[in-house]
Amino acid sequence: MAKHLFTSESVSEGHPDKIADQISDAVLDAILEQDPKARVACETYVKTGMVMVGGEITTSAWVDIEEITRETIREIGYVNSEMGFDANSCAVLSAIGKQSPDINQGVDREDPRELGAGDQGIMFGYASDETDVLMPAPVTYAHRLVQRQAKVRKNGTLPWLRPDAKSQVTFAYDQGKIVGIDAVVLSTQHSDCIDLPVLQEAVMEEIIKPVLPAEWLTKETKFFINPTGRFVIGGPMGDCGLTGRKIIVDTYGGAARHGGGAFSGKDPSKVDRSAAYAARYVAKNIVAAGLASRCEIQLSYAIGVADPTSIMIETFGTEKVSHDIIVDAVRQNFDLRPYGLIEMLDLLQPIYKKTAAYGHFGREEFPWEATDKVEMLRDFANFK
């Protein structure tokens, strides 16, 4: 591919779908703190004045779902009815059942190492050397824009900002290399007291310029800041939100394939989540080791079966050693059974609420972002 454009988007923690994701993962974390072996599939729906939390949970833990929900909304910043949503006054409904025993009998085993996959499915992981976090640049910078929006909202730099926001960044490439940013879109909810020209200038100076590298911005770069002219009604008052509806934002911004399974609200026995994390871990270590510049991993599973039904590795012609060597290195050095994924990445910890906004990948605080297999891979491939 010669010259081309590629675009990715992100949304803020105050976006309705992300509110739902964060509530689902906050419930998961609270349960895992008490019962690491719990089975959790927690879904959330939010709309004006109400939250519904439902799903299937089997656990010895007791958690206060209403208080967890309110505290999560409070932390995001919806604490005033003028915003259309208020953590202190919204209704919280709960509809929780237990995991089906038909599923459970296929997952749990006498030998925990033979833990079966919680469902069938396909999962992808990806890494690229175009950023320092080995992620595609468009989604990386889209996340950073809405993270910056939240920061200047919460620290009072721009006190008229409100929690809901979206970003979109279009990068220009030539022969696979970034040559600049073609377009930037940032839409942010705001109070009724701010004029559009003032908002646009403040967003440019306090959000966009501090985030996007100056060398990629040119006089041809197009900026669209609140292009509708008004964004006062937002959050759950503007749109309903559902868990699992931002799966491309959560992953690679469309730069890699996606198996279709969402992450939030699912315990690590669900390979939709744990295997996607493991696939990212494997791909990132391959790229960090220098064995390829780009790497995509596909894993697949059958419900109740421990071993993956397939492993596929694609390096897009960027491999520096034989493709067969890379495949052998992965098969012989990574345990990709559900138990192996959980042990390898220490996934029974209550770490998931932090993942539920601004992307699950490219953030060094998460264990699947470690590059601790680099030397092993280089030694195996005899690559120095």
Swiss-Prot record:
* Signal peptide feature range: none
Q: Name one GO cellular component term.
A: cytoplasm
Quaternary state and interactors: Homotetramer; dimer of dimers.
Residues engaged in binding ATP: 15, 164-166, 230-231, 239, 245-246, 262, 266
Query: What is the species of this protein?
Result: Photobacterium profundum (strain SS9)
Q: Tell me the compartments it is located in.
A: Cytoplasm
Cofactor, free-text remark: Binds 2 divalent ions per subunit. Binds 1 potassium ion per subunit.
Query: In the record, what lineage is assigned to the organism producing the protein?
Result: Bacteria, Pseudomonadati, Pseudomonadota, Gammaproteobacteria, Vibrionales
Uppermost EC category: transferase
UniProt lists the gene as metK
GO biological process, alphabetically ordered: one-carbon metabolic process; S-adenosylmethionine biosynthetic process
Give the primary localization class: cytoplasm
Keyword tags: ATP-binding, Cytoplasm, Magnesium, Metal-binding, Nucleotide-binding, One-carbon metabolism, Potassium, Transferase
> Which pathway is this protein assigned to?
Amino-acid biosynthesis; S-adenosyl-L-methionine biosynthesis; S-adenosyl-L-methionine from L-methionine: step 1/1
Q: Where, in this chain's numbering, is Mg(2+) bound? A: 17
Q: Quote the PROSITE patterns the UniProt record gives.
A: ADOMET_SYNTHASE_1, ADOMET_SYNTHASE_2
State where K(+) binds.
Answer: 43
Name of the protein in its database record: S-adenosylmethionine synthase
Binding of L-methionine occurs at 56, 99, 239, 270
Q: Which cofactor does it need?
A: Mg(2+); K(+)
Q: Give the Enzyme Commission number.
A: 2.5.1.6
Report a single Gene Ontology molecular function.
Answer: ATP binding
Q: Which reaction does it catalyse?
A: L-methionine + ATP + H2O = S-adenosyl-L-methionine + phosphate + diphosphate
